[in-house]
Amino acid sequence: MTGKDLPLTEAFFYILLALRHPNHGYGITQEVQQLTGGRVALGAGTLYGAIQTLLERGWIAVWSEDSESRKKKEYLITPLGRTVFEEETRRLKELVSHSELMEENEQ
């Protein structure tokens, strides 16, 4: 992992979050929509482009593949992907903490 890996795009963040358990493309989009109350809707191009990039970076891996259908694959976050996700979560928590401090100081 390098410093240029962070910050994650919103799509990467939610895809990694949805892959804490094995999941396929449609399942990922459904979970992301549910998590965000519909605010984030991943189109097929965005989703599969992001999946390809995450696979290339080693942040996710193919978990299972339907031998009868070349399209049905499940993916899972890797240990490296989990590390990247945890670093991003720490970064976001720090941002929120600083924002809360600013609000407290203004009161």
Question: What is each residue range found by the language model?
Answer:
Residues 16-17, 30, 52, 86, ...:
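A cross-family signal for key residues in well-ordered alpha-helices
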Residues 70-89:
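Basic, amphipathic "hinge/linker" alpha-helix immediately C-terminal to the N-terminal HTH DNA-binding motif
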